[in-house]
C-alpha cells in the first residue's frame, strides 16, 4: 500500500492524495455475492429529506458481507482482496473447504493464500473469529457483535480496532477506538486484529466533483440561507448567527448529547466524553 501525491496538472488534482494498493483485485467482483441497491438520495418512503447532503453519485452493487462468520471448524483460504465502494475498509473473498465463497472485512496483515478459521477452537491469529470468552484479555479485536448471533456491528471501518480489557461473569469489557468502554456478552463473536486499509484517512479528495461521484452533495452554511430555511439565516449583508450554533431544526450542534437509546445505556461503562 502506497500514498501517492498526484502531480498538479489541474487545480482539481493539485491537492489530491491517493492511497494505492497493488494487491487489490483488478477484475469484476464475485457475481454470486452481489446485490442491487437503489439510490435513496437521503429520502424516506414519503419522499421527505431525512439525511441531508446525499444524492447522485455512481451506481454501485452491494457486496454481501459475512458479518456472522458462523462456519465453525471449516478452514477458509483468502482468494483475493477487493475494493468495496460501500465502505472504507477493503474486503476479502474467502473460499471455504466445502466450496462456499464469502466476503469478509479484510483484516490488517491478511494476504492472499492465507488460511482463516472461525469458532471457539480457532487459533489466536489475525483474521480468525472466536467468541469473546475464548479470546485472551488484552487482545486487539475488530468486527465485534453487540448481540450473540446478530453479526458484527462495532469496529468495522478502515483502520479501526478495539481492545478486550476484562471478563467478569457473562460479560466482557471492550475499549473502542473512541475511548468508550462497553460491556459485551462473552458469547458475542469478534475477529482478531485490526481492520485493514489503515491509510484510508490520509487520502485527500482534491475536488468537489470527486465527492459528487460518491453521492455526497454540498453543505450550505446556515448564515447564507434565508430565515425560513435556517435559524441562522437572514439579516442585511453578512451577519453573525446571533445565537448558539443549532441545526436547521433548532437542536444545539456543539456538545449537545442526542443519544436516545436508553435500553442499552447500562452496557456503557465509560462514555467517550470525559465530562
Curated annotation (Swiss-Prot):
GO terms for biological process: cytoplasmic translation. One of its GO terms (molecular function) is rRNA binding. Residues 224-257 are annotated as: Disordered. One of its GO terms (cellular component) is large ribosomal subunit. InterPro entries: NA-bd_OB-fold, Rib_uL2_dom2, Ribosomal_uL2, Ribosomal_uL2_bac/org-type, Ribosomal_uL2_C, Ribosomal_uL2_CS, Ribosomal_uL2_dom3, Ribosomal_uL2_RNA-bd_dom. Keywords: Ribonucleoprotein, Ribosomal protein, RNA-binding, rRNA-binding. Transmembrane segments: none annotated. PROSITE patterns: RIBOSOMAL_L2 (PS00467). Belongs to the universal ribosomal protein uL2 family. One of the primary rRNA binding proteins. Required for association of the 30S and 50S subunits to form the 70S ribosome, for tRNA binding and peptide bond formation. It has been suggested to have peptidyltransferase activity; this is somewhat controversial. Makes several contacts with the 16S rRNA in the 70S ribosome. Part of the 50S ribosomal subunit. Forms a bridge to the 30S subunit in the 70S ribosome. This is Large ribosomal subunit protein uL2. The gene is rplB.
